[in-house]
Amino acid sequence: INAPQLRKELEYTGAIFQTTIDSEVIAYYIARERLNSQSAEEAVRRACQRLKGAYALVVTSPRKLIGARDPYGFKPLCIGKRDNSYIITSETCALDTIGATFVRDVLPGEVVTISPEKGIESDMTMALPKEKEARCIFEYIYFARPDSHIDGVSVYASRIKAGKFLAQDSPVEADLVTGVPESGNAAALGYSLASGIPYGTAFVKNSYVGRTFIKPKQSSRESSVQVKLNVLREAVAGKRVIMIDDSIVRGTTSDRIVRMLRDAGATEVHVRISSPPFLWPCYFGTDIPAREQLIAYNRTIEEICQIIGADSLGYLGIDRLKEMAEGLPICT
């Protein structure tokens, strides 16, 4: 949150930045604190104490591996081991891909230092009381890979659960359940399992196009959707389709996807969203726009349904969202 303020402070003292990313601000502070610290880990801790917001850091030195997680636990971070080597990574799926074993999560507010001499050392100076912790629920809904576990909760299982809740709370008659890839797929499978409506693939995804909702301009978001997704006509033609997506932020990409399904021959398109309506922007680093740009701002679900051109629209309730997180304290 306070990255702009910290950047100005550094520039005032002569710092010259090469990028606009927040990570460079953190790197500068770690470098400066190192001049007055007895160790690299102390410099990391002292730098992190100046930060307000969400972060998960990994810092390396010739003999040490240091990881730091913000006091609220917004962003995930975990430790793995392969043979005699340690790994610190944001998601457990990275450990699987290199044949490493999961050791444990880095706790909210923890700074861990790993060295050959002392193994894993923990500093909990920045830790907050448990009731103040707040995981970013968007990690489970959208950001994280489904084959990851965050703080002991399976991302895949949580998305399956969200889909089942949607089927129970927002049922509709249809011939096919499909997900908007990738993050909508598991929720769509969960909806299918709970409703008995067949699950199928309706979209082919271009894996070379990045995430669309974080594109800076509306025109680039819309063009990215068309390049990123193509509809399998044979899968949807003549069918009533339930389309599961992880969220609706501005609504323009949802409108485009609904039209693509109709153009491919779907007779009905029912949209189900595996998260509650977005009513507020995120102040902790996720590129969610000003409140006035959110489609759910000052609109009913029926009005949103009309805007995106769907036959019906249903969202996951906030209480269901908490159930999906299996009791973890979350930021919503």
Question: What kind of feature is each model-predicted range?
Answer:
Residues 19, 24-27, 199-210, 307-325:
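A conserved beta-strand->alpha-helix junction
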Residues 48, 63-64, 69, 99-105, ...:
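PRPP-dependent phosphoribosyltransferase catalytic core
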Residues 2-107, 113-174, 180, 268:
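Conserved short alpha-helical segments that host acidic/polar catalytic motifs at enzyme active sites
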Residues 15-18, 36-37, 169-175, 193-200, ...:
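Secondary-structure transition/capping motifs at alpha-helix termini
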Residues 66, 74-75, 95-97, 120-122, ...:
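Flexible loop/turn segments at secondary-structure boundaries
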